[in-house]
């Protein structure tokens, strides 16, 4: 009898608690959340990665929400070059990268395989477009109308990126290409949040060399003041180091009312190395984040992690920075700014989809090769 009472009072409630919890993320566990991850790749450069259900287990109770995307580029495997060695990363082969549009359908279907409660923890992003192509905007619209209710933004996509840009097949993407302007104009119209990667400088610049990247990205931001843009990694790369007085430059830029739509993510362990390289670098970074607490987001930039420890290692790396932040700045960096920006984008994008989902499909005009005569 005592065992029966014990079973009813303890075991059965525990069973239902487990049954209705969301992959270990019960309602009462929100206080344990350390991070809303604004920058995460579910798949790698050969479109392989972590199963999304497994990734929910990796997130556990420590990560609340995640901006979810793949990699827009596929690394080519050229047998005549590497033989049976199948490269899985862009630094592992001399062969080109090419844009892989199916990544958006893959991310959408992974998201749609989840329950509504699980879906609420993700903000899928569109990445499978070529930013040098005037048709890129048409691809983005097509993805939204094919998968309504799924996507929140676009990115991470790259314009100038060390090693990568020169490997992409076809015309190189540039900051002054009208195709990019067309993309960002549509994001302003639809409410899509943008995650843009553009290096702040070229690799191994010579002393006194002109930094043309800075002026071009300033001009881009000025042309698109109605588009919410997250500048990934603050322009820093694996070998693209922070430029001289970068924090002072960033301070000046963020102070301008004309840049109120620009946000910075400090994702990637390579960026964390630079920020924590010296006490001075850490203090300077903390000072700017404390001054503009609404403008920074935290992401991991991990690619297809296999366990929680490797997924969240960046949080330990950034501890010296976190220790110098005010409570308000730390909360907004780690969680609050994500919720504000992505929640707003969700509402706007759903409204755009509702207004345009039944738009008539345009019939393209006949071309000389089609053999169809104009009426």
What are these regions (language model features)?
Residues 28-33, 82-202:
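Active-site gating/metal-coordination segments in enzymes
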Residues 161, 166-298, 367-374:
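Catalytic pocket-lining loop regions of alpha/beta-barrel enzymes
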Residues 10-22:
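Bacterial N-terminal signal peptides
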Residues 2-4, 27-38, 47, 51-66, ...:
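Mid-to-C-terminal alpha-helical segments outside catalytic/metal-binding sites
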Residues 41-43, 71-72, 127-131, 157-160, ...:
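Active-site beta-loop-alpha junctions enriched in small/polar residues
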Residues 36-40, 66-69, 122-126, 153-155, ...:
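Hydrophobic faces of well-ordered beta-strands that scaffold small-molecule active sites
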């Amino acid at each position: 009898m005592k065992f029966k009472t014990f079973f009813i009072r303890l075991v059965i409630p525990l069973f239902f608690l487990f049954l209705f919890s969301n992959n270990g993320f019960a309602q009462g566990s929100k206080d344990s959340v350390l991070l809303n991850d604004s920058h995460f790749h579910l798949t790698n450069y050969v479109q392989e990665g972590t199963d999304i259900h497994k990734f929910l287990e990796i997130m556990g109770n420590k990560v609340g929400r995640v901006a979810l995307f793949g990699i827009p580029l596929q690394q080519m495997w050229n047998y005549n070059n590497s033989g049976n060695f199948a490269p899985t990363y862009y630094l592992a082969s001399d062969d080109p990268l090419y844009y892989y549009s199916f990544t958006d359908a893959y991310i959408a279907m992974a998201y749609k395989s989840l329950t509504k409660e699980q879906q609420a923890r993700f903000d899928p992003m569109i990445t499978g477009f070529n930013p040098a192509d005037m048709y890129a905007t048409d691809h983005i619209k097509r993805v939204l109308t094919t998968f309504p209710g799924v996507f929140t933004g676009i990115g991470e996509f790259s314009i100038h990126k060390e090693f990568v840009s020169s490997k992409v097949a076809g015309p190189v993407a540039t900051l002054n290409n009208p195709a990019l302007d067309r993309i960002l104009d549509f994001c302003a119209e639809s409410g899509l949040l943008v995650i843009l990667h553009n290096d702040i400088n070229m690799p191994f610049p010579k002393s006194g060399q002109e930094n043309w990247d800075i002026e071009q990205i300033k001009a881009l931001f000025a042309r698109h003041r109605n588009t919410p843009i997250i500048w990934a990694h603050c322009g820093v790369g694996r070998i693209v180091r922070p430029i001289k007085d970068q924090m002072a430059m960033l301070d000046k830029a963020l102070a301008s009312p004309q840049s109120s739509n620009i946000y910075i993510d400090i994702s990637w362990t390579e960026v964390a190395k630079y920020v924590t390289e010296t006490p001075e670098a850490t203090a300077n970074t903390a000072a700017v984040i404390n001054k503009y607490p609404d403008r920074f987001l935290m992401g991991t930039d991990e690619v297809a992690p296999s366990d929680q420890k490797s997924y969240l290692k960046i949080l330990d790396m950034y501890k010296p920075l976190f220790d110098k932040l005010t409570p308000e700045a730390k909360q907004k960096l780690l969680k609050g700014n994500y919720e504000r920006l992505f929640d707003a984008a969700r509402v706007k994008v759903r409204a755009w989809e509702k207004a345009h989902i039944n738009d008539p499909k345009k019939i393209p005009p006949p071309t000389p090769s089609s053999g169809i005569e104009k009426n």
